[in-house]
Structure formats: structure tokens, C-alpha cells
Amino acid sequence: RMKVCQFMALLEQMRIEEWEYDHDTAYGRVDCVGIYRYTMYWYYSASSVKALKISTHVEGTYRNSVYNKTDPKKNVVGKGKIDANTEFRIGMGLFRNPFGDDGHFAVYVGNYFPGYENAVIESVYGGVIIRELSESEAINDPFTHYGYMKGIDYTN
């Protein structure tokens, strides 16, 4: 599986190259959950993504983040509702309002990148950006759920 440090490097490349926000996922253009989906295709071959059963469907990724039972055939392999006891880990997916029209996904990066303490990387209308979690939540409401994403090794 892809190490978290490799996942972070691919996300950082998107930010450095100033990828744009777009519902059509392609090189240089991704929507919010597209930052995860595109890194899976980038790291693994298309046939490997299929063999790993990594879904390319946005709604499926959102919905699996909030169901009581984790579906191992979906992208989120471990998850929960965010509360005061949630321990954020670098590379963890964060979900906001997964069932609403304004649902959103970001990746928690914490202090992985210099100059940030408690940050997320996300694709928003301004493109792929890193900003403090508190700033993202102040603009768009708090994230409600977290999940460990399929294809990523969180042990490193």
C-alpha cells in the first residue's frame, strides 16, 4: 500500500502545480474527493485500482464515511463521527455533511508541511490548497466524520 508520506507528496505536488477545482477529474483538475481518487490512479495502475476495489464514485465515498457498517468494497476502511475524543492522524480523510448538497472532503495533514500546525489539504474553488483546519471549518462549517482511506498505509 501507498505510505502516508507518498500520499502527502502527491497531494503537495497538486498544490505546487496549482491544480484547479473541477468536477471532472483529470491531470491538473480535481474536485474535493478527486484529490484522493486521483492519487490512487497516480500511484496504482488503473487495473490495480480496480483489483483493490477502490471506488471512483464520489457519492459512494461520502456515504461509506457515515454508515454504521464499513463496506470493505468502498474507499473508507475505518471511520467514525468526529467528537472531542477524535485523534486526527496525518492522511486521514475528513468529511463534512456527506449527505448534503454541500458535502466536502479534505485530507488532514496536521503539521506535515512547514508553516502549518493543524492543517488540511483540500480542493476548493480556488484550487488545491493547504490551510489550517480551523480556517476551513470557519468558512464552511465543521467536518463531521473521519475515515482511513483504502490503499494508504497509515502505519508509517
Regions found by a protein language model. Give the residues of each.
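N-terminal capping segments
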Residues: 1-61
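...with weaker cross-activation on analogous glycine-rich loops/strands in unrelated enzymes
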Residues: 46-135, 141
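Non-catalytic ligand/cofactor/substrate-binding and regulatory segments of enzyme domains
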Residues: 1-21, 122-156
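Intrinsically disordered, low-complexity N-terminal regions enriched in serine/proline/glycine
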Residues: 20, 35-42, 61, 66, ...
